[in-house]
Amino acid sequence: MIKNAFISLQEKKEESRGSVEFQVFSFTNKIRRLTSHLELHRKDYLSQRGLRKILGKRQRLLVYLSKKNRVRYKDLINKLNIRELKTR
């Protein structure tokens, strides 16, 4: 439901499945799905590794977006209910 609504919002702008926002959104869906899987299967180490890789990819995209356009970054963080990046 949420995914379809977000996709329809993104498609109204244009064919933007390669946009940073859409990529972060799809990674967030994968992360949530893997997290629920790992709650049931705690010893699934390959899924744990995949989760860490996806988390890293999403973090790199969020760092890129926060440097390029802070307003779009804040808007995306609020829409997806994820925490803001830690700054060093």
From Swiss-Prot:
A Gene Ontology biological process term: translation
Subunit structure and binding partners: Part of the 30S ribosomal subunit.
Gene3D superfamilies named among the record's database cross-references: S15/NS1, RNA-binding
InterPro entries recorded: Ribosomal_uS15, Ribosomal_uS15_bac-type, uS15_NS1_RNA-bd_sf
NCBIfam families: S15_bact
Protein's cellular compartments: Plastid, Chloroplast
MF term (GO), any: structural constituent of ribosome
Record protein name field: Small ribosomal subunit protein uS15c
Origin superkingdom: Eukaryota
Natural source organism: Aethionema grandiflorum (Persian stone-cress)
Keywords: Chloroplast, Plastid, Ribonucleoprotein, Ribosomal protein
Major place of residence: plastid
Membership in a protein family: Belongs to the universal ribosomal protein uS15 family.
GO cellular component: chloroplast; ribonucleoprotein complex; ribosome
Alphabetical list of CDD domains matching this protein: Ribosomal_S15p_S13e
The encoding gene: rps15
